[in-house]
Amino acid sequence: MLTSNLGYPRIGENREWKKALESFWANDTTEEQLLATMKELRLNHLRVQQEQEVDLIPVGDFTLYDHVLDMAVMFGIIPKRFLQQGDTPTLSTYFAMARGSKNAQACEMTKWYNTNYHYIVPELHDAAPRLTKNAPLEAYLEAKNELGIDGKPVILGPYSFVKLAKGYEEDKLQETIQSLLPLYIQVIQELVDAGARSIQVDEPSLVTSISAREMALVTRIYEQINEAIADAPLFLQTYFDAVTFYEEVVSLPVKGIGLDFVHGGAKNLEALRTFGFPEDKVLAAGIIDGRNIWISNLRERHELVHQLEQHVAKDRLVLQPSCSLLHVPVTTKREEKLDPTLLGVLAFANEKLTELHTLKQLAAGNEAEVKEALEANDDALAALEKSGWRSGAATSHNLENKKRPQSFNERRPLQEEKWQLPLLPTTTIGSFPQTKDVRRTRSLWRKGELSTVEYERTMKSYIEKWINIQEELGLDVLVHGEFERNDMVEFFGEKLDGFAFTANGWVQSYGSRCVKPPIIYGNVSFTEPMTVAETVYAQSLTDKPVKGMLTGPVTILNWSFVRDDLPLTVIAHQIAEALTHEVTALEEAGIEMIQIDEPAIREGLPLKAEDQQEYLDWAVSAFRASCAHVKATTQIHTHMCYSEFHEMIEAIDDLDADVISIETSRSHGEMISAFEKTTYEKGIGLGVYDIHSPRVPSEEEMLNVIRRALTVLPASLFWVNPDCGLKTRAEKETVAALKNMVAAARAAREELKTKA
């Protein structure tokens, strides 16, 4: 029996990866220095896995930005706006696709399945695939030559790669995949020729609700690869849920099949018991949760391994995490400030690999060798049970299915009379640039090196500065800027009971953007007002409305590491109940325009269609519960980003927010197209420019977005706003972009007057 890993966190123990990238983008380091740092990190990650005694160590999972972007560039799938014809892609090309450039809009970015990782969407229209290099081969040879590691190259499989892309017609799916197949065959053949004995081909899309026709297409794809390269050592890897067509998947002509026995594990286990497993294949079993940070109950996991052994011989069983460890932090070893009981039940990437080794030893009958580890595991779980953190009432049942007593059509005239806003009102999503000074002020205060009085005075100065800037720009609805917030989830978690925070528990969200998710370890409850002071101060500086800014219950849930002993709906409603108190406090303080952000509501959507309605029901219920009690004149806003929202437009409508803003610009008009087929009759803002790129769009460019949106949405309900918060942008580009945005809105108003 062997152990395997599917992928390792890229960012480094101290976010060295992030720092190297941002230093390069700021022109503080050269390309050579960047590549040298990245190589050092890459090799170090391999050494760590080698020290953890992982038998099959992944290579090629490391990236300079995103692994899907890597595949697109490797296959020459580079939109024409980034390349002159015949050009070879450079590092500049690569980063321009991810981040945009002065002359070209960045490629779209969206969620990686139902996670908080974002990938760059390949654009297949007009693509002429060609192999620009064999990146998995380079990674394999580097590991072999530098460290003597016979690694397991990782490749995103052809079916999933195309399904994650855009710019192809569904009825031409087979033709599109066929155009890439010769390149896949060449990459795999060169790996085999170089001596690779295991090649991981990721096909996570096989756990979604694929059709029988598409499953037949997948079968044909792998038959063609097998015909071209007999006995290629392919491990077809799935994760995040159970496979939809178990019998067909395990019958594919590959050496091994990777199944997730954590997420969707019950269905995979049931299928294994019902249909068995081919005697000529290896089962790579995901038995350690790669997406959450709790230790495994090693005795329960050992029992699962024992159950698997009833159907698969030991020498054909590989133990591994349920998915890439990209989704968890690197190690707990620097978490010195956490409660010892809580720390004892946490396992990040390195600790999960240790658990794998322990389970391998147990399966081999070497219990004496891991006796100490088993006892420590027992003691840690017992201490958690004894702590009492998870006992007591879970949530108020009367919160479920609550809604505002008045319909939107009843509220709308009351709100219009109260707020007296112009047509196409302009606003921002919430945050303004967090400069080095802002971050330094927060850091000094947290360390106790700055008094609370001085900290609050400084924060007020930032708020006053940006209220003045917003008024000078002519924005209609203002925000206080969120300078006191390091992270939109962490900020609230720190002020609610039931949350804990790591010192170094960073994970990659997109590009160099890392987040430090809070840990929900116990029952969540309200303690005191969290946002009232800053918002009320901002409102005192202006006659224009200032929005209160909250993070919604579903986003707090989806962007946290969540306790594993309660249904998610219960935890979501606990958070909603806490937020009702904050909404009430804002309203009582005179803040009657309140934004409850739900950027992560889409990413929690289950991957199988049959499981989605249940999730949407409780997600909508939790959001509505947080604000169902407000006055009819109080205007509730929400914001969402990076998602295929046309899939869930009914649920968005059911949220019953008075105004919703949605990320639009990176989808290059596709979000607007979705409204051609769907009627939406509440306030809505489709982001008119991409805030994830340093590029400043022109007034005309944003005006064109507004014009296009107004062909499918009524002007009387349309708002003008950026795609997302402006926290990560520089001040100069932020002011320039907002100036153009306000000018575009005013120009659009004039055009509407002329038409009228």
From Swiss-Prot:
Describe the task this protein carries out.
Catalyzes the transfer of a methyl group from 5-methyltetrahydrofolate to homocysteine resulting in methionine formation.
Cofactors (names):
Zn(2+)
**Could you tell me which SUPFAM superfamilies the record lists for this protein?**
UROD/MetE-like
The free-text note explaining how the cofactor binds reads: Binds 1 zinc ion per subunit.
Residues reported to bind L-methionine: I429, G430, S431, E482, D597
**Active-site residues, Swiss-Prot/TrEMBL:** H692 (proton donor)
List compositional bias (Basic and acidic residues) regions by residue number: 399-411
Disordered: where is this region? 392-411
* CDD domains assigned: CIMS_C_terminal_like (cd03311), CIMS_N_terminal_like (cd03312)
Q: Keyword set for this entry?
A: Amino-acid biosynthesis, Metal-binding, Methionine biosynthesis, Methyltransferase, Repeat, Transferase, Zinc
Annotated signal sequence range: none
Positions with a binding annotation for 5-methyltetrahydropteroyltri-L-glutamate: R15, E16, W17, K18, K111, R513, C514, W559, E603
What's the protein here called? Answer: 5-methyltetrahydropteroyltriglutamate--homocysteine methyltransferase
Report any Pfam family annotated for this entry: Meth_synt_2
Q: Which residues bind Zn(2+)?
A: H639, C641, E663, C724
HAMAP family reported for this sequence:
Meth_synth
Q: What does the record give under GO molecular function?
A: 5-methyltetrahydropteroyltriglutamate-homocysteine S-methyltransferase activity; zinc ion binding
The protein's annotated catalytic reaction(s) are: 5-methyltetrahydropteroyltri-L-glutamate + L-homocysteine = tetrahydropteroyltri-L-glutamate + L-methionine
At the top level, the lineage of the source is: Bacteria
Name of the gene encoding the protein in the UniProt record? metE
Q: List the EC numbers from the record.
A: 2.1.1.14
GO biological process: one example? methionine biosynthetic process
Q: What is the source species?
A: Halalkalibacterium halodurans (strain ATCC BAA-125 / DSM 18197 / FERM 7344 / JCM 9153 / C-125) (Bacillus halodurans)
